[in-house]
């Protein structure tokens, strides 16, 4: 991971245009290729970001970050106050709480509860940056990656986006790979971002799933 603290301005050029005026900010460049711009506020949320895969071109005083859709972040750097790179190694990942772990078990037995026609290929399919909860196939034989959360939020969409970018490069899988964020509830912000990323959303009833026998069909 590369950490850069710099006085900079930022322009987003894509479907919309956005501008961050000059200020001191933290630039995070992660090993997965993502770039995010942070202020000393907003908790963990960046002011702007570019999800992987993307290409970073560093010129004198300017970074140009371009993704597959040809959207760009143009970071104009006036002064660098700190620049360091750290090797963090492979992260073991976040352990799911009891509900999320149990949901994964239940939905592995009943993938049709996520979306009609899904069949399970494998649980915990490794992507190289962490395992996606369920790898499935739909009725047409297409690959579907399902990420399971107790509550679906923006972080879950970002996580699934990173997994999908890796799965799209997996030669063992039929392409393209679609994504579904599955949770007991999903926030409006997460739904909006998911729709923008081409990710479907599925809400499941944990209590109902716990009471279902595998032989009993259900509609959600």
UniProtKB/Swiss-Prot annotation:
Its main location: cytoplasm. It is found in: Cytoplasm. Cleaves both 3' and 5' ssDNA extremities of branched DNA structures. Keywords: Cytoplasm, DNA-binding, Endonuclease, Hydrolase, Nuclease. The lineage of its organism: Bacteria, Bacillati, Actinomycetota, Actinomycetes, Frankiales. It comes from Parafrankia sp. (strain EAN1pec). It is an enzyme of class 3 (hydrolase). One of its GO terms (molecular function) is single-stranded DNA endodeoxyribonuclease activity. One of its GO terms (cellular component) is cytoplasm. It comes from the Bacteria. The keyword Manganese does not apply. NCBIfam families: PRK03298.1 (NF002876). Its EC number is 3.1.-.-. This is Endonuclease NucS. The keyword Cytoplasm applies. Belongs to the NucS endonuclease family.
